[in-house]
Amino acid sequence: LRKTLLELGFKCIEEIYIKERSKFYPVMVLIKGEDELSKVELTYGKVALINNDEVLKEYLLKKKDELEKVFNKIASSRVKGDLELIDRGLDYYGIK
């Protein structure tokens, strides 16, 4: 969304996040203009980040927790699979 708005010649001058029914939404005030945004600013909103928006912080912490759980499950299953493969290899040596 922010990338498209920039391409259309708009820049955000005010931004807050709101939470409704466990969903997060950015609310922006735009004016005609140009701005340069880093990848993180483009993703989450430069103004909201600079202003330390509390709802955005809650969103980021929630997403981090969700992704870490997914990552740990993937990593665990990958490690488990690797260990099983190693055990099968050690079976050739009579090692349990």
Residue ranges of model-derived segments:
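Class I S-adenosyl-L-methionine
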Residues: L1-K96
